[in-house]
């Protein structure tokens, strides 16, 4: 069962990676693949059981225990994707100016808590929609990757 969860997580990881990469070409994946947001739900479907495999009791060395059960390449890969997710999120905030793209009164706008930050062209609107997906998918990759590696390498003694 752990291996099945791991494979499911790898499918989620590579799907998230593909979605993420598409946004660099100004593509809004949610426009072409409406179910793309299912990837957001998938991280919870996998990450919560991964926490059970790891043990739910609060631990001071939670991450050290997770990393101890995996090979060195897994630790480095997760750390690299985690660092990328932080940088990606900062870039997302910068590029979106803290706003969300929307259509209001037939106009493309960027708004923040109901306040219009500025009007957008249709092209800018499409890019802003892509930035939103990019902001989320950067985190999806980390959650799927951690789940995949933990499920694959966690010892058989783990309760699940």
Describe the role of every protein-language-model region.
Residues 1-51:
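Transmembrane alpha-helical insertion/packing segments
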Residues 118-138:
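Short, aromatic-rich amphipathic segments at membrane interfaces
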Residues 96-115:
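Juxtamembrane non-transmembrane "cap" segments at the membrane-aqueous interface
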Residues 1-7, 71-83:
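Alpha-helical transmembrane segments and their helix-start/interface "positive-inside/aromatic belt" motifs
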Residues 51, 131-160:
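Transmembrane alpha-helical segments in integral membrane proteins
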Residues 60-63, 101, 158-160:
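Short, Lys/Arg-enriched, Gly/Pro-containing loop segments at transmembrane-helix junctions
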Residues 77-100:
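Hydrophobic alpha-helical membrane-insertion segments
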């Amino acid at each position: 069962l752990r291996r099945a969860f791991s494979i499911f997580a790898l499918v989620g990881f590579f799907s998230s990676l593909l979605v993420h990469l598409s946004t660099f070409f100004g593509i809004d994946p949610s426009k072409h693949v409406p179910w793309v947001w299912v990837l957001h739900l998938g991280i919870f479907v996998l990450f919560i059981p991964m926490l059970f495999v790891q043990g739910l009791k609060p631990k001071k060395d939670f991450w050290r225990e997770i990393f101890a059960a995996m090979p060195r390449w897994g630790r480095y890969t997760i750390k690299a994707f985690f660092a990328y997710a932080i940088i990606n999120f900062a870039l997302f905030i910068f590029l979106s100016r803290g706003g969300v793209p929307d259509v209001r009164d037939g106009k493309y706008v960027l708004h923040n808590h109901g306040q219009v930050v500025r009007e957008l062209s249709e092209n800018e609107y499409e890019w802003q929609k892509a930035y939103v997906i990019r902001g989320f998918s950067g985190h999806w990759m980390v959650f799927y990757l951690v789940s995949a590696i933990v499920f694959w390498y966690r010892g058989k003694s783990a309760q699940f």
